Amino acid sequence: MSMSSPDITKKLFGGVLDVDGAGFYPGLELLNFVLCCEEGVLPSQDNFTLTRYAHDFARRLLKDDSLPKDEKRKVLMDQDSEDAIRRLLHCLELDVANIVKTKSWERTHFFPYTRSLIHWDARLKGKNIQIERRYLRGGGALAFHILRKDENSIRLQKIRDGFDLLFPDNEDTPLESLASTLRGRGQKDGSPVKDRIEPESILFNDELEELYRDGMMNILSHIELPRVSRIRSVINWTGIWLVIMQNARSSDALGLERVNLIFDCAGSHGQLRRASQRCLKDSISKVFLAASNVADGKSSKQQLGKVRGAFAATAAAVGLLNSWRGRRHFVMGLDALETMVLACLEGESEISFERFGMDWLYEKCRFVTGRESAQDADLLNNFDSTIFEENERQLAEQMKSTGLLTIYSDATRMISTGALR
C-alpha cells in the first residue's frame, strides 16, 4: 500500500506536515483548537470536542462577488456600510505570501486579533458551506497535542492561564462585537465534533518538545506587551519550532549528527552567504531523504515533495529565509527576531546578548550567528573568525534598531522587550 505525505510525516515528525498547510497555518490551527475546544483550554483528556466556525459570510464579503445581495443586506444596511466593512476586513486579513493567483475566499483567513476572528477552513459545495480541512492540515494539531500532554503541571497551567489572558471570554471591544456578529452569520458545527488528526499525533518526549513548551510559556508570560505582539509570536513560534524540529528529527532518522543552521545576518560576506545557502540545501535534502527512507519505496515523488516543501515554505513564511524562491539562505527577519526574544525570556526578564546568541539561539535552536557558536560548530577551520564577528555585530545592530537590545555605558549589551511595550 502506498504511503501519503501525512503517513510519512506522522511517523517521521509526529504529526501531519504538508506544504499546503505550511507557514502560518499551523499557528492558526493551534489557536482554533485552543479557543474552540468545548472542554476548556488544553484539556488533559483525549475525548475532547470542538465547535468550529467557518466565518464564511465575512470571508465571502471580502473576496466573493457571487455572495447574494439579499444575504448582505440582512447584515449590512446599504452599499456604504458594505464598502466600509469590506475595507476593515481587508485590514484584518492574514498576509500570505508566495501566492501567484488572486486569493479566493476559501484561502482568505483573518489574523486572530480577537477571539471571534478565529475560524476553520471551509468551502462552498453546491449551495452549502462545508467546514473541512484545506490549509489547517495538522501542524497545529501536533502543536496542540504537545502542549496539552505536558507532564509539567506548573508549566501547563501557566500556558493555560496565558491563553485565557490572551483571549478573554468577557472581551467587549468594538472589533470583537463586529467579528462576533459577522461570524454569527456564517456556518458553524451544529454540535461539537471530535477531531480525527489530533489524537493520532505522536509524542517523542524529547528536548525538542520541551523547547516548544518553554517557548510558548515564555511568550504567553509577556503580559506587559500588547496582545497582538503575543498572538503574532504564538503563530510565528509554532512555525519556527516546526523548522527546528524537522531539521533535527530528519538527521535523527538518518542516524546523522544534527545540522546547525548558518544564518547570514550581515549580508556582506559572499562566503558566509554561500555557506548558508549550502546549509539550507543540505537541510532540505535531509528532510527529503529521511522521508524517502520512511516511505521505503511506497510513496510517489509528489508526496515526498510535499514533505520537503513544508520545511522550506514554513521557514520562508516565518522570516527565516531571505526569499521564497531563487537563491535562498537563512536570515533572521524582524518578526522572527521578536518572536525568538519573547520565546527566550520569561516576563520582563533580560539576558545578555552573548548568552542569547549562545545559550538560546545556538544551544537550544541550533542557529549559528556569531563567533562563539561558529567555533563550537567547528566552522572556523573554513572561515575567518572576523566574518562571524561582523555577522554578530550586524545582528546586534538590527536588534538595537528594533528596540530589542540596549547597550549600556560599560558596553554591556542586554536583550529585553522593554521597547516593545
Predicted regions and their residues:
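Generic recognition of cysteine residues
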Residues: 36-37, 91, 265, 279, ...
